[in-house]
Amino acid sequence: MNARERDLQKGLRLLHLLHQTNPYPQGPGTASQRRNRRRRWKQRGLQILALADRIHPLPDSPTEGPLDLAIQRLQNLIIKDLPNPPTSTPTAQASTCIPPIWDQLVPRSNPSSSQGCGRDSCERGEDLVGSPQESGRRDHCNTQEDQTRG
């Protein structure tokens, strides 16, 4: 490690220590006490940022060298001619090639007439668990009739 890298590491350790010495304010108190603690915490944080900028100033603009190199590389790019598209039409085998995951899928069958119209049908002879409904039970879909009776 050369001297520049050691100085940089030392500065970064100092910045890390400075940030650790200013934790976010915690604790009970009235709203104005909490507000004042947050205000002082923010002021200390701004002072730490000012010190950090003095310890390790960031460059104002990126160096010119890498940008010029990138521009030169972009200028050297060449668009090549694309090959001619294929003239033959696809064969029947290519159109029937189905990925293996789709090959195993089986379409759902339509529900039988004894099961009603679908999942939410009230005319079904079975409830959601699959056991037959009791004959004494009222149809739970006719809630308006139940409300007018009661």
UniProtKB/Swiss-Prot annotation:
Domain of life assignment: Viruses
Compositional bias annotation for Basic and acidic residues: 135-150
UniProt feature, compositional bias: Polar residues: 20-33, 107-116
UniProt short sequence motif Nuclear localization signal and RNA-binding (RRE), positions renumbered to this chain: 33-47
Protein's cellular compartments: Host nucleus, Host nucleolus; Host cytoplasm
GO molecular function: DNA-binding transcription factor activity; RNA binding
GO cellular component: host cell cytoplasm; host cell nucleolus
Primary location group: host cell
Keywords: AIDS, Host cytoplasm, Host nucleus, mRNA transport, RNA-binding, Transport
Chain positions of motif Nuclear export signal and binding to XPO1: 69-80
Region Disordered, residue ranges: 19-39, 102-150
Coiled-coil regions listed in the entry: none
Any one Gene Ontology BP term: mRNA transport
Stretches for region Homomultimerization: 14-22
Domain notes: The RNA-binding motif binds to the RRE, a stem-and-loop structure present in incompletely spliced viral pre-mRNAs. This region also contains the NLS which mediates nuclear localization. These overlapping functions prevent Rev bound to RRE from undesirable return to the nucleus. When Rev binds the RRE, the NLS becomes masked while the NES remains accessible.
Self-association state and partner proteins as the record states: Homomultimer; when bound to the RRE. Multimeric assembly is essential for activity.
Function: Escorts unspliced or incompletely spliced viral pre-mRNAs (late transcripts) out of the nucleus of infected cells. These pre-mRNAs carry a recognition sequence called Rev responsive element (RRE) located in the env gene, that is not present in fully spliced viral mRNAs (early transcripts). This function is essential since most viral proteins are translated from unspliced or partially spliced pre-mRNAs which cannot exit the nucleus by the pathway used by fully processed cellular mRNAs.
Protein name per the record: Protein Rev
Species the sequence originates in: Human immunodeficiency virus type 2 subtype B (isolate EHO)
Gene: rev
